[in-house]
């Protein structure tokens, strides 16, 4: 799974982990990415890696779930 949002391009960032004695070591801040089925304008459906901000803002259009039988 890629660590980048398909729509906004959000990816991991580098920062510092700061201890009580103010010693700094490098760490990574990973975005909250989810794998979601997305329906495109032509009707095709693909599974994409999307951040939760894009999910909440309505960028992703989920396909209709049809009942069997």
UniProtKB/Swiss-Prot annotation:
Q: What do the Gene Ontology cellular component annotations say?
A: ribonucleoprotein complex; ribosome
**Lineage: superkingdom:** Bacteria
UniProt keyword annotation of Ribosomal protein present: yes
Single Gene Ontology BP annotation = translation
The entry lists its GO molecular-function terms as: structural constituent of ribosome
Q: What are the protein's UniProt keywords? A: Ribonucleoprotein, Ribosomal protein
S-S bridge residues: none
Which HAMAP family does UniProt cross-reference here? Ribosomal_bL28
Descriptive protein name: Large ribosomal subunit protein bL28
